Amino acid sequence: MQIRNVYGIDLGTSTVKIYDLKKDTITKEKNMIAIRNREQVIAVGNYAYEMHERTPSNIEVITPMSNGRIANVLMVEAVLHTLLHRCTRHMGYRPELYFSVPCDMTEIERRSYYTIAHKGALKNCRMYLVDKPIADALALGIFQNIQCHRYICAGIDINM
């Protein structure tokens, strides 16, 4: 039985996918957030998507990601924490979060993922960034029958 809580997270431009290893479930919701007067969060995920283009002028429904990149750190943080709370009520002690990220990210973009993950209830979490091609290969089961070898090449640690 799995004791620790492990989550795989894909913050896509249009959808957020969260895999819970303990429950073996995938939560898939729209990556949208509804905000009143630019400060109060009203709805997140599919609830915000249902409000899209049907809201009064003081309520904005936005996508906090743009072209696979974080456009608004505070809004992505609100989306992530709300959807993780919907996924599981109790995160446990030091949950592990694996984020699927683009390969060509800058250090500033990488830092924004760390900023998002270490807020609120997740401040004691272990967080890892996994390149999208590697995450896709793992999801397809390509690496299941490969023995692990570690190569250190020019100061770069490569796991194969």
What is each stretch, according to the model?
Residues 1-29, 34-42, 46-154, 158:
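Nucleotide/phosphate-binding catalytic cleft detector across ATP-hydrolyzing
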